[in-house]
Amino acid sequence: PPAIGDEGQAIGTYQHADYMINKQIHKSNVYAGIEYDNLMDVWPYKYEKADYKEIAQEIANGKIVGWFQGKSESGNRALGNRSILADPRNPDIKDIINHTIKMREDFRPFAPAVLEEHYKEYFDTRLPSPYMSRICKVKSDKVPGITHVDNTARIQTVNKKFNKKFYNIINEFYKITGIPMLLNTSFNCREPIVESPKHAINTFKRTELDILVINDKVIIK
């Protein structure tokens, strides 16, 4: 489940009761936040149309990206709509993000978002983990940026059906680097995960994020 906690218990209890009483089955949808229209119309910033190949190349070159797409996620995990994305091959990327963007403790790890068809090549687990709820051993030394000190990672597996845009940006990075994953952490700086375009832009401005992608628009510092 995407919301592991009291809020998830409440939602699950409601769905169970609805099924028992009305035989109503609710389809899972982790992206249950607000849909924002005309996102950039009120912002006097220069922006370009998003090109996934170019964004993936920038990540491969060491840039760190704020990634804002559609509706926000339910629960406390960033699952590809309110994320900070970076190159998992960089052994220093954890320190860079912790010290210049997240402003948090050094010991806290970062998660990989990996293409579902490739997760078994890099992680010792038999089951996919679409909600970033599974911790497993890392089998490769090619991705130190997402490997914790005990050689584990809390993985998110991504397929096209789950989140097409997120899948596509990871896939473009894979085509460039041969690594089918990105470092994925929540889009925030010592506060709740960003919800609105205004919140995303303010966080972008006051941190060392290099690029901000809001749906199909790109802002570069």
Give the ranges of each region predicted by the language model.
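Flexible beta->alpha loop and helix N-cap segments adjacent to enzyme active/binding sites
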Residues: 1-221
